[in-house]
Design a protein with these regions (language model features):
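The feature captures the LRR N-terminal capping module
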Residues: 1-180, 187, 191, 195-203, ...
Length: 250
């Protein structure tokens, strides 16, 4: 079957899932956006440079995967997909996201790793249900304070960016268990990280850290800190060194 046959069949059957991965697609036919029943759409490994505005018509979508394409931007209409729970955009060429992504308040998992993001919109603070956020291997220089509002976030991946600092508001992530920030330009870690009561693993390799805040000893669930490839000229505070059950990888 050719592409239009596949799409027409899915429309006739009121399909909930459609896999159009690895089809060599450069453009998406308008007929695709007439399948109002769609809840899951896979467009991975194509040659898409953009998503058309009509993507916003698929209002029942719960999962959208457009990984390993050539996307350079997202349309504002992405914000119309308010039922979306899973958004996968890894391995593209996105340099920014529209502010309308803040409308996607039902998101649970978001992967925008391996892009060219320079910044992230403040509206990320609306993603209160997000559990896993992957932003590693981008070109981020800052993270908005609003990320501290993600009360259900368990895993945050910020490794291999250009961050010189991270906001103190990260200390408000009450559910956070895994925080990866290796391969950045960090010289200090905020004292507020000591409030991360569920944090188990903190990876800070390959930064510019001279020491760590003593407050990290207050992270009662902390099992592992990794600080390889840091200057650490001031050493670690005694409270961290003496913390029972803590493995320090350096």
């Amino acid at each position: 079957m050719n592409l239009l046959d596949i799409i027409n069949k899915a429309k006739a059957e009121k399909a909930k899932t459609l896999d159009l991965s690895q089809q060599g697609l450069r453009l998406l036919p308008p007929e695709l956006f007439e399948i109002q029943s769609l809840e899951e759409l896979n467009l991975d490994r194509n040659k898409l440079v953009e998503l058309p505005d009509d993507i916003g018509l698929l209002k029942n979508l719960k999962s959208l995967s457009v990984s390993e394409n050539d996307l350079m931007e997202l349309p504002d209409t992405i914000g119309n997909l308010t039922a979306l729970e899973h958004l996968y955009l890894g391995y593209n060429s996105l340099s920014e996201l529209p502010a309308t992504v803040g409308n996607l308040t039902n998101l649970h998992t978001v992967n925008i790793a391996k892009n060219q993001l320079l910044e992230f919109p403040d509206e990320i603070g609306n993603w209160a249900k997000v559990v896993k956020l992957s932003l590693h291997d981008n070109m981020l220089t800052t993270i908005p304070d609003s990320v501290g509002k993600l009360k259900n976030l368990v895993k945050l991946y910020l490794d291999n960016n250009d961050l010189t600092e991270v906001p103190a508001s990260l200390g408000n992530l009450a559910s956070l268990e895994i925080l990866m920030i290796s391969g950045n330009q960090l010289s200090v870690i905020p004292q507020e990280f000591g409030k991360l009561s569920k944090l188990r693993e903190l990876v800070l390799d390959a930064n510019q850290l001279e020491t760590l805040p003593e407050a990290l000893a207050d992270c009662k669930s902390l099992e592992t800190i990794s600080i390889n490839e840091n200057p650490m000229e001031d050493g670690l505070p005694r409270a961290i060194l003496d913390k029972k059950g803590l493995k320090i990888d350096q």
